């Protein structure tokens, strides 16, 4: 469909060829260029398609014959009327503003232009001015061939102003006339659109302003036409009170509409150049990216050119916390446009984004952010108990003192959780690690704080990275914590222990069924039963499936993988009141029973080591032999076979041992002590050559046929690898007699021989070094291929160290002497014997 473009600023010497050359690449049909000429250099160009018209508009500001031209969307109706008036109207062309050759009379044909606009994809400049009638009313009159010589009201509308114009420039343009006010119209983004409405002191001054029609302001000509009070009020002006100024009004212009601008604009039939603007009618703006320290005074200073009060500013809150959003309401269009012009203005080192917004959208955003949620009610006022728990009788327990942590590593320890909350005075008894029924960690924990204020501060660590993982924190109450098997009072665990100590074995036997499958076997004939509260005191939730048999349990709401077997009442397991044992002093509490002297007694009151982070092992662990729970076997057991050593342990060997020897701790289950290694001499190991890992009978020089135990990963002749975690031994922690500062000092009495396996430590390696590079470094030396072990820290990052195993001592000593100080990549490595 053909689209008409209006061109202004065409030089006198330019012709149709120059215009076609200017629009080179765009399709202009034959006869599509119509040059009107005149002082403004007007012309109309017809383009074949909408796309060509869009591309043509983008060339506005270009040059034709060294003259800048401007392009506007137009229509065939405007073009035809302009050509017709150019040919017929010749009166008054010598005086500016009075000639019939002007385009001002075109603006009376609003009905014809509406029809053109209905099928055109563009809003032409004529269409935007269709509502400006010279009599100041909304009535459509017949076209007149001459411009009025006298103004009907003191308001004039200006078109074609430079985009950088200000009010002073307009007053200079009307020099000699009394101008009361100027309103510069703007786009929705705050930029001037080249239009303005001017209010004069009287109609006489306004009539003088009409004579400035088509006068130049700088390099641009200005169109001056009659305005109306409606337009002045609509664009931010105030209504003139009194009837001193002569005006022509219709009966529909009532004072109430002039006072209430919003109601007037809603019902007015006059059209203005801003009729197609995207600006909202409510004069609301949405401020974004504000600093959290910004207050209303700062915003008033930002909009200092507007009439703004504190009541017109609204900050947006979410869960009683300030956000970076705010809304501002302006009273008139002028202030509204001024505010939009401050888009991306820097306020407190942050660019403030100012966008127009409707009242409906503003209300929706505020309700969305400030809608109170049930879980946020407890965080609003520290120390306040929610009505829900108060009505149910939970006077103090409704406070949210606990933090529920998720997304932790499955093998996290209490000490690590305690380090995460290093800013809070927590003890390990305040931390509970959740495990499944097999003893495997769930990656979840419960932490209790002394006050609700501390818990709220700890919740700020939500989504912080811990051990390389982003953890999730949630504030919960003690009632919600009970759903995990934790009593509302944190002292309930200690009370349970006191009660259990005050009972003897016969009194406590009623707590469990004799056929309870949760009995934990420590040997072939002995069985020990653990009370669940003992394990809960340790901070873990591992529980066999046979402890409790309640059928009315259900999963707690809003939590994942919660233990379910600890929701029984506390009173079920005690035969007397809670306060009975607490009335006794600490020194009068009954002593613990020693299960080594009486195997038939119930040992639920077994004391757990508070200083160690003990995670209860799985149920299969308690079916193992005594060797799993004995820290220091007799010396002669080293000369027996492994099966004989741990299956036939006489009871008399342990009856006279101290209590400390039988305290179950994490160290007893995983690591031997220094004394174990010092008691084992080299001569003792030589007596059992088939158990000497350095001299196996079936050893061969090939790395593929090298015999090692199944758990072997870091061989040392003095270590029983069945007790080590992951088959590794910490040489730094457990330094033996021949190890000084991490270096191997050979024993002259010990015959290393050629069949012994020697470990070599490589230090100062590049962090990106791999096993192949290390093997290439030892090229020519007898290194066991699969023995290269690169050391990593707790976070999984390389330490720049590695350990390799060599076939004999002489080969290792030669490698240390020859290769120490040589480079591996950019670094010089250091070798030492282990």
Swiss-Prot record:
Q: Keyword annotations for this protein?
A: Phosphoprotein, Repeat, RNA-binding
The record's InterPro entries line, in alphabetical order, gives: ESRP (IPR050666), Nucleotide-bd_a/b_plait_sf (IPR012677), RBD_domain_sf (IPR035979), RBM12B_RRM2 (IPR034588), RRM4_RBM12B (IPR047188), RRM_dom (IPR000504)
Indicate, by first and last residue, each region the UniProt record lists as having compositional bias (Basic residues).
259-277
Bias (Basic and acidic residues) occurs at 244-255, 550-572
Alphabetized GO MF terms: RNA binding
Please state every residue range assigned to the domain named RRM. Answer: 154-229, 283-359, 401-478, 758-834
Q: Where is this region: Disordered?
A: 237-277, 546-572, 621-643
CDD domains recorded for this chain?
Answer: RRM2_RBM12B (cd12746), RRM4_RBM12B (cd12748)
Q: Which residues carry this modification: Phosphoserine?
A: 701
Q: In this record, what's one Pfam family? A: RRM_1
**PANTHER family in the record, alphabetically?**
HETEROGENEOUS NUCLEAR RIBONUCLEOPROTEIN-RELATED
Write the protein's name: RNA-binding protein 12B-B
């Amino acid at each position: 469909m053909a689209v008409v473009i209006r061109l202004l600023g065409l030089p006198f010497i330019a012709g149709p060829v120059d215009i076609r050359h200017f629009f080179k690449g765009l399709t202009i049909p034959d006869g599509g260029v119509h040059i009107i000429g005149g002082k403004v250099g007007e012309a109309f160009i017809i383009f074949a398609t909408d796309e060509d018209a869009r591309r043509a508009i983008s060339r506005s500001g270009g040059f034709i014959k060294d003259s800048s031209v401007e392009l506007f969307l137009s229509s065939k109706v405007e073009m035809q009327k302009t050509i017709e008036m150019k040919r017929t109207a010749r009166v008054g062309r010598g005086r500016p503003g009075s000639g019939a050759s002007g385009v001002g009379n075109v603006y009376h044909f609003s009905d014809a232009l509406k029809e053109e606009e209905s099928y055109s994809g563009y809003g032409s400049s004529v269409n935007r001015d269709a509502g400006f009638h010279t009599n100041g009313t909304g009535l459509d009159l017949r076209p007149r061939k001459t411009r009025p010589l006298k103004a009907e009201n003191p308001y004039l509308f200006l078109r074609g102003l430079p985009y950088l114009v200000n009010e002073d420039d307009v007053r200079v343009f009307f020099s000699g006339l009394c101008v009361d006010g100027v309103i510069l119209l703007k786009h929705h983004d705050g930029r001037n659109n080249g239009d303005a409405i001017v209010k004069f002191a009287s109609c006489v001054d306004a009539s003088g302003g009409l004579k400035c029609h088509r006068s130049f302001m700088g390099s641009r000509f200005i169109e001056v036409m009659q305005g109306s009070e409606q337009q002045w009020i609509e664009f931010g002006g105030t209504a003139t009170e009194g009837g001193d100024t002569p005006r022509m009004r219709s009966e529909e212009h009532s004072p109430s509409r002039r006072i209430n601008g919003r109601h007037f604009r809603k019902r007015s039939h006059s059209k203005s150049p801003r009729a197609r603007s995207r600006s909202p009618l409510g004069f609301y703006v949405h401020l974004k990216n504000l600093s959290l320290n910004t207050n209303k005074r700062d915003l008033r200073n930002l909009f200092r050119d507007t009439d703004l009060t504190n009541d017109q500013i609204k900050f947006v809150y979410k869960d009683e916390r300030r956000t970076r959003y705010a809304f501002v309401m302006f009273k008139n269009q002028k202030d509204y446009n001024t505010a939009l012009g401050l888009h991306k203005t820097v306020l407190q080192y942050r660019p403030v984004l100012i966008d127009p917004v409707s009242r409906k959208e503003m209300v929706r955003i505020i309700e969305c952010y400030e809608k109170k949620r049930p879980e946020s009610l407890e965080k609003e006022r520290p120390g306040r108990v929610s009505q829900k728990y108060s009505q149910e009788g939970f006077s103090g327990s409704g406070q949210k003192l606990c933090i529920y942590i998720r997304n932790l590593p499955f093998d996290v320890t209490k000490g690590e959780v305690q380090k995460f909350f290093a800013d809070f005075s927590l003890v390990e008894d305040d931390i509970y690690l959740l495990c499944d029924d097999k003893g495997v960690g769930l990656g979840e924990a419960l932490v209790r704080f002394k006050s609700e204020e501390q818990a709220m501060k700890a919740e700020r660590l939500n989504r912080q990275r811990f051990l390389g993982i982003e953890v999730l924190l949630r504030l919960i109450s003690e009632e919600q914590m009970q759903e995990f098997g934790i009593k509302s009072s944190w002292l309930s665990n200690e009370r349970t222990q006191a009660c259990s100590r005050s009972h003897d074995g016969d009194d406590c036997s009623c707590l469990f069924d004799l056929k309870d499958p949760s009995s934990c076997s420590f040997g072939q004939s002995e069985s020990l039963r653990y009370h669940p509260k003992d394990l809960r005191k340790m901070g873990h939730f591992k529980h066999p499936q046979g402890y409790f048999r309640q059928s009315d349990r259900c999963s707690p709401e809003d939590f994942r993988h919660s233990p379910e077997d600890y929701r029984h009442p506390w009173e079920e397991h005690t035969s007397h009141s809670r306060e009975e044992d607490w009335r006794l002093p600490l020194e009068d509490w009954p002593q613990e029973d020693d299960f080594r002297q009486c195997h038939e007694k119930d040992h639920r009151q077994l004391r757990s080591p508070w200083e160690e982070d003990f995670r209860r092992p799985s149920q299969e662990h308690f079916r193992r032999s005594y060797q799993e729970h004995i820290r220091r076997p007799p010396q002669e057991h080293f000369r027996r076979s492994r099966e004989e050593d741990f299956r036939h342990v006489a009871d008399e060997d342990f009856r006279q041992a101290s209590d400390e020897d039988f305290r179950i701790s994490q160290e007893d289950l995983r690591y031997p002590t220094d004394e174990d290694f010092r008691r084992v001499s080299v001569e003792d190991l030589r007596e059992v050559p088939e158990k000497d890992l350095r001299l196996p009978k079936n050893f061969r020089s090939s790395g593929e046929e090298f015999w090692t135990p199944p758990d072997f990963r870091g061989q040392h002749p003095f270590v029983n690898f069945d007790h080590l975690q992951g088959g590794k031994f910490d040489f730094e922690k457990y330094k033996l007699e021949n190890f000084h500062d991490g270096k191997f000092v050979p024993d002259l009495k010990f015959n290393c021989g050629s069949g012994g396996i020697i470990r070599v430590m490589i230090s100062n390696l590049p962090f990106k070094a791999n096993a192949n590079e290390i093997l290439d470094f030892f090229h020519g030396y007898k290194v066991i291929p699969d023995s290269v072990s690169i050391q990593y820290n707790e976070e999984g990052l390389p330490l720049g160290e590695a350990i390799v195993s060599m076939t004999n001592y002489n080969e290792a000593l030669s490698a240390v002497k020859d290769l120490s100080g040589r480079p591996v990549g950019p670094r010089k490595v250091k070798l030492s014997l282990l």
